[in-house]
């Protein structure tokens, strides 16, 4: 099967609704409690047994997830969606994060809306609607990759243990019998899906079809508008604060600085499990937090472009360069037949849990079918065609 490589999908343009918290911590509209009675709301399950394994949130509380059971032909198939929410890059920021659901399960919403990839309606999610669907809550601040602690600051950096403890709990609830499984994630959860992809695959026997998808998790090692590297500074803080040099892939850390191994472009070619990269070439989070954050945009000349997509010609030229750099960073990865790539042209960040981008529901001649079709074609190997 050839790689599904899309160079743009402009009809999926749409501004994602989000609010920026500390250091770009993001909560999308589809994680709210919502008001639409037709939206599937799924309750929170806490993994009490995780405490004995040291698999705890920043504040020491146990981790949690939301599970919607599959049925019919999907009863033995599983989707695991890792929640996003940026990172904490210093002791102070991690302590602040403890005061939210991104650092403590005691403060997590008790229900979340399941939309897009997590929808249980065939009309909204044709390939995966009847699968078992899980959303794993993010409360460690380092993309489920830490395994250390700071006793003096009363901080637990146990993301990797959380991932394994939740997976063990789900195995006991039937995932062990999975015939097909997909590990996915949004934003920093999309980065997690890359980092934990092979670990996830190793949980299953060879007879289980296991693949992974990163949605808006391809954070590029890019130069910002001032000529600096804003995201490098943030990632260096995350890696040093949580000691990720001990947990990031040694195939990467053995030859470049450990914090660079938090950038997907330096590790994706070593992922053995089939992996799908879904990202916007005009990623709204990266534009506002990596390319033109306030620290790099002292004059504020990028504000309208970053947050309202009202960009000048020169700014669009800069952003086109960013998109081309993203495509270039994926060239080698896309040559592996097991992998898939979909780079859209929408002004967005996280598209698999948005119904209007995941599966809009129209497929007439010349009209977009939605991301769901591309992901389904890749996962089930239904097509060999490339699209441009």
From Swiss-Prot:
Enzyme active site: 187 (charge relay system), 283 (charge relay system), 349 (charge relay system)
Record localization: Secreted, Cell wall
The enzyme's E.C. designation: 3.1.1.-
Coiled-coil ranges (or none): none
Cleaved signal peptide residues: 1-24
Pfam families in the record: PAE
Positions annotated as glycosylated: 30, 33, 304
Entry's Gene Ontology BP terms: cell wall organization
Enzyme class: hydrolase
Entry GO terms, CC: extracellular region
GO MF terms held by the record: hydrolase activity
Keyword terms, alphabetized: Cell wall, Cell wall biogenesis/degradation, Glycoprotein, Hydrolase, Secreted, Signal
Family recorded in the similarity comment: Belongs to the pectinacetylesterase family.
PANTHER family linked to this entry: NOTUM-RELATED, PECTIN ACETYLESTERASE 1
Function: Hydrolyzes acetyl esters in homogalacturonan regions of pectin. In type I primary cell wall, galacturonic acid residues of pectin can be acetylated at the O-2 and O-3 positions. Decreasing the degree of acetylation of pectin gels in vitro alters their physical properties.
Name of the protein: Pectin acetylesterase 1
Species the sequence originates in: Arabidopsis thaliana
